[in-house]
């Protein structure tokens, strides 16, 4: 005779306890839009407050997340910093490539693009990347380079190299035409260094327009 009470559930029929992590919240599941919101918020806070002074809690609060939710998207605050820089460089590369295509498309049929026009376009795009709307990503890279790990730094440096490589053919063409007298590698370093420094002093409410800046930079480095 069975000693179990009537209606008892066999072990094989008992409901199983869920295993693994608890079910993700909406903030944690939406890995696309929410991740981008985190990236933009992190870029803005890292630029305004600095990497060391910004906590993951600050970033989560900026987008209305719980304090632990960012860790479903990034392993650490350091990984988020590297992600901000990587996204900034990928965006910069895409915008630069689009600029060069537009310059080539605007050249007369069968003619090569003007190195002056192409360089001016690159300078203007670079200013927009640094100073235009949603422009926190690259300034964070300029400010917080030393906060990266060596492995992160190497990955971002590869993207930087690819971005800067597009400037060299234009400077070489200008040198061949007698318009540039400096070593092209040094000229590129000095030019980009001067443009990048604009994040320290530019004020859109008081300073010249980005077009004015591009014209002035071209005239300074490649005088007529």
Task: State each model region's role.
Residues 128-132, 140, 164, 173, ...:
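Amphipathic C-terminal alpha-helical segment
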Residues 37, 45-79, 83:
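Helix-turn-helix
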Residues 1-33, 100-107:
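N-terminal intrinsically disordered/low-complexity leader segments
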Residues 83, 97-136:
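Hydrophobic alpha-helical connector segments
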Residues 34-43, 59-60, 84-96, 167:
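Generic hydrophobic, amphipathic alpha-helix propensity
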Residues 90-97, 132, 136, 140, ...:
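Amphipathic alpha-helical packing segments from all-alpha helical-bundle domains
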Residues 35-36, 56, 78, 82, ...:
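Short, structured helix-loop boundary elements
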């Amino acid at each position: 005779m069975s000693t179990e009470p009537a209606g008892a559930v066999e072990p094989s029929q008992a409901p199983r306890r869920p295993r693994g992590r608890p079910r993700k919240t909406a903030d944690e599941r939406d890995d696309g839009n929410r991740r981008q919101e985190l990236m933009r918020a992190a870029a803005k806070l890292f630029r305004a407050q600095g990497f060391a002074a910004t906590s993951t809690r600050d970033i989560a609060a900026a987008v209305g997340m719980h304090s632990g939710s960012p860790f479903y998207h990034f392993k650490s605050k350091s990984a988020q910093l590297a992600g901000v820089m990587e996204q900034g460089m990928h965006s910069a590369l895409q915008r630069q490539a689009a600029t060069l295509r537009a310059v080539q498309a605007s050249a007369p049929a069968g003619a090569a693009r003007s190195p002056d026009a192409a360089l001016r376009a690159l300078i203007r795009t670079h200013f927009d990347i640094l100073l235009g709307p949603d422009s926190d990503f690259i300034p964070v890279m300029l400010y917080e380079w030393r906060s990266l790990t060596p492995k992160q730094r190497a990955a971002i440096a590869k993207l930087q190299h690819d971005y800067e490589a597009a400037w060299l053919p234009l400077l070489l063409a200008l040198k061949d035409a007698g318009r540039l007298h400096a070593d092209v590698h040094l000229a590129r370093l000095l030019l980009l260094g001067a443009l990048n420094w604009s994040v320290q002093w530019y004020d859109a409410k008081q300073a010249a327009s980005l077009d004015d800046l591009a014209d002035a930079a071209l005239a300074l480095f490649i005088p007529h």
